[in-house]
């Protein structure tokens, strides 16, 4: 039986564009390399603005998972902590509400600009890989009926 294709949506923040645009390029390239289709890329002003776009994508039947890409850079106040924690919390809530994976490819909080630049490829590719693995594994979990012994889903 041929495995069903995986269709991703990507939400990318425009704030810290020099970083997030490179993250988007890396994510798209990695998805192509892994033979996964990116159906929609939506840009939002900042990381804090992601939840509505994520929700809209999760409502679509042609989206199996959403990858988020952003960079929350440390400033002189604790604003970065607020943005990162509130966004991450809402991302988790949306994932469980819609029963679809939403992966966290957001650099920060507390990262300097230099640290964020160093993490561009790692965060972008890991977010894509996590989305793919979660879709594959939750599909396997959905196929389980009655079981009599421990099942490990990889």
Swiss-Prot record:
Keywords: Riboflavin biosynthesis, Transferase. Its EC number is 2.5.1.78. It comes from Saccharolobus solfataricus (strain ATCC 35092 / DSM 1617 / JCM 11322 / P2) (Sulfolobus solfataricus). InterPro entries: LS, LS/RS, LS/RS_sf. GO terms for biological process: riboflavin biosynthetic process. (2S)-2-hydroxy-3-oxobutyl phosphate binds at residues 76-77, 119. The keyword Transferase applies. This is 6,7-dimethyl-8-ribityllumazine synthase. CDD domains: Lumazine_synthase_archaeal. The active site is at residue 79.
């Amino acid at each position: 039986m041929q495995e069903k294709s995986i269709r991703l949506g990507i939400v990318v923040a425009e704030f810290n564009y020099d970083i997030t645009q490179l993250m988007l390029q890396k994510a798209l390239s990695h998805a192509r390399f892994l033979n996964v289709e990116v159906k929609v890329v939506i840009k939002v002003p900042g990381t804090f603005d992601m939840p509505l776009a994520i929700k809209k994508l999760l409502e679509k039947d042609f989206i199996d998972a959403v990858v988020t890409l952003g960079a929350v850079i440390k400033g002189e106040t604790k604003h970065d902590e607020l943005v990162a924690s509130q966004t991450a919390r809402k991302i988790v809530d949306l994932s469980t509400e819609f029963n679809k994976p939403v992966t966290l490819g957001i650099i920060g909080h507390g990262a300097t600009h230099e640290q964020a630049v160093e993490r561009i490829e790692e965060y972008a590719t890991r977010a894509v890989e996590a989305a793919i693995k979660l879709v594959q594994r939750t599909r396997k979990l959905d196929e389980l009926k009655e079981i009599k012994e421990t099942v490990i889903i990889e």
